[in-house]
């Protein structure tokens, strides 16, 4: 293995309406915010405990949900990503790995303005939080 190799934990996003079937061993608040906060805390703890980085996909989803509630991140099942959600996640991963803004002309057939917004959100979420994400 390369001495420059890094383990990167992929912070997932909360379900659209939160955890609808809580289990005693893993208590979560019913809503999206509670589930997302628990996921964020857990992924960051794993990154710190293992000397790894964290790709904050869930944090980027939270930002988009807050700033652009009309952006459809979820498929109809309310768990899996629609194209904009996958596009956002991919941009978070690239920005995390590169540790610099990742820009591409590829839009996944999204409107150009939406693709640019998702790219900027991914960049901002990663680059404004390098210490929190254990990258620096």
Feature annotation, model-predicted:
Residues 1, 13, 27-29:
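Long amphipathic alpha-helical segments with strong coiled-coil/leucine-zipper propensity
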Residues 1-8, 52:
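A short helix->loop->beta-strand "cap" motif at the edges of active sites that frequently abuts
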Residues 10-14, 57-60:
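Active-site-proximal beta-strand/loop segments in catalytic clefts of secreted hydrolases
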Residues 20-22, 26-122:
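Catalytic His-Asp segment of secreted/periplasmic serine-dependent ester chemistry enzymes
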Residues 123-136:
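Long, charge-rich low-complexity segments
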